[in-house]
Structures are given as structure tokens and as C-alpha cells.
Amino acid sequence: MKHEVLIAGGGPTGMMLAGELTLAGVDVAIIERRASQELVGSRAGGLHSRTIEVLDQRGIADRFLVEGQKAQVTGFAGVHFDLSGFPTRHPYSLGLRQKHIERILAGWVDELKVPIYRGIEVTGFAQDDTGVDVELSEGCSLRAHYLVGCDGGRSRVRKAAGIAFPGSDPTTSNLIAEAELAETPPEWGIRRDALGIHALGRVEYEIRNGEIFYADHGPVGVLVT
């Protein structure tokens, strides 16, 4: 089977690109290793103003806004910033877990009738003057004019293409987990000590007047730096 563009990776980046190309009249398909769009764990936790502006341009921002939590305050290095005066129609960030972001985007690309080849991975590819043959984990292949790697920071497509990923060494590392706690901690929020910065908070929460109110029950998000 042949497409104009094949996208390796059906996460937020891959689905958004597929939607944009489809709206431009391009025959595009997604190759996604997961059998469904279900996502285990928290991963990303929200959207920023510019992202919401782009979603608004496509007429789908309200799908995210109705499910998320708006916050007009953000923080950096312990300093809080008021976003209410930002020159945008959306002067806030939106708290919304990636599993919900992906579900909403998947519904959008489904409406656009973007084909998604699920449960398979790109294992390699061979280019020529007219396109690229994409090898798949099932032992078959697909043909396209272009292959786009939207398969994450450890992108197999990027590595196979020999594309460098320059940058500086990390100065900190983070561990993120979801846990069921036997006892409720005395205090939610961010802690700082000699070992670094740590945070505890329920995965489900509400934002009211710039303050976070955590759910009484459910898994706890843990961040350790």
C-alpha cells in the first residue's frame, strides 16, 4: 500500500501533524506501536497558550478546554508569574493529562479519516529517488513519498536516518511515578531539601482562583529530582 506521507508515532505530535496534512489535502497515515490509544501513567500534564491558539485555529480547542483546568499562574524556580495579562486569547495554561490529550486528538484524526496502522513498529526503511520503503515489524512494508519520525526522543527513524541530536548534557534528572499511598501525607505540593526538589499531589485535581485542590482519593503523582 502507498501513501504520500507516513508518520511513525501516534502520540500528540504525530496525530497533530497527520491532522494538519490531511486538512491540506495530503494522503497521510500513522504507524503506531500501541494496539490502542490507551496510555498508562501521567506523562505530560497540560497545554500552554500557544498550543491552545493552534488548536483554536483548527476549531478543536473547546474539546480540550471543557475537560481541562485553567490556571493563570505559573511558576519557575520558585517564582510565581501572573499570566492574565498575556497578549493572547488564551492567557492561561491548561491542566490536562496526556492520556486525555491523546484521546481527544485521536477522535479528531478519526473524524478526518486518517488511517492508523496499530500494533506495529517501523523497523527500518530504504530511500530512493522517488520515495521510501518503510519496513514494519509484521514483516511487510509500506511505500510513501516521505517518512516522518514522530516516535519520541529516542526516535528510531531519526537514528536510522543518521540525523544528529545535538545538545548539552543534563544538569538534573527526574523520576515521575504514580503510587497508591497507605497514608495521606501531611502536606501536598513541592518540597526542597539538600537532595533536590520533590513534589506530591493527587493525579486528579481542580484549580480554583489559581489554587490547586486535590481529590480526596485516587493515585498520587510523585516527582523526584
Predicted regions and their residues:
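Core Rossmann-like FAD-binding/catalytic domain of the broad FAD-dependent monooxygenase superfamily
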Residues: 1-225
